[in-house]
């Protein structure tokens, strides 16, 4: 007979979570840290100015049933490049609870950007709309935001007012204290990223 602890570990999780990845924010913070001398693990998947990913980025969600992980980003280039990036993201996996039966591949939300600029608002707006939509439709019990952008603080306030648990993960570089203050749990991605 299994101990209560073992039963809890192997039981399918009941709390539903969705993960929202501000890929634009993550990739620029990652690149900044690399430029400052940090050495990434060999397993990191990186396309300059487009995405950075490691399946351990969803570490905080492993005790939840992760329904979906949506990766929001921009691409400069033609439609073929946009499709290629979408396919690359769709082929990547996230870590999940060992008893989960759901698929664990990323759901890409890729915006085409015609000019090379540092950032845009399409990612932030779409991520916010999607998060609020899922929260108010009752699709989730918890959310995990991967971003260090303090602009999401009011969004997290609304999510918490709806009774949803809020988890936030980001690189230490520029990790907004206003996000950390609003999160029920915080995880810095540095430990899973650098050698």
Regions found by a protein language model. Name each.
Residues 94-195:
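Nuclease catalytic cores that cleave nucleic-acid phosphodiester bonds
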